[in-house]
Amino acid sequence: MFGKKNKAVTFSYDDGVTQDIRLIEIFNKYGLKATFNLNSELLGTDGSLVREGRVVNHTKNKPEDIKHIYDGHEVAVHTLTHPNLHKTEDDNEVLRQVEQDRINLSELVGYEVVGMAYPGGGKNCDKRVAEIIKNNTLIRYARSGDVTKSFEPFDDLY
């Protein structure tokens, strides 16, 4: 996969927040690339999160700005509305959350989006969800936020 090298460093950021604009400026300055995992139905919404006791802006970039903001970087699926897919009992809803987000994002960026990050952090997918995605969408890889404490590449791309 990586020629003679067998390890890689990746940068991956979730939710399509306005802070990505500054982050991308820094990445571009130093010739770095990243993947940005977006929820197409949440684009353009205001929000905030509490992190380490501080309120942090979590406002999403607007749909009409996505192509320009993320140009030169990968955009990937993060589902339409950020549900915990392994807790979503309806297989059709899992499929809708993933494939419709992929279609929406592909239209916004002008190329086929084929990557995905499961929403929710930690161990946030199961075999059922992975099989739905693998067998019914155009997604070619999906990653979890699960902490492995290992630098070993995954055997299964879903």
Regions found by a protein language model. Give the residues of each.
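Short, glycine/acidic-enriched loop or turn micro-motifs at the edges of active sites
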Residues: 17-18, 81
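Metal-dependent polysaccharide deacetylase catalytic core of the NodB/CE4 family, i.e.
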Residues: 30-126, 136-137, 145-158
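N-terminal pre-catalytic segment of deacetylase/amide-hydrolase enzymes
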Residues: 1-11
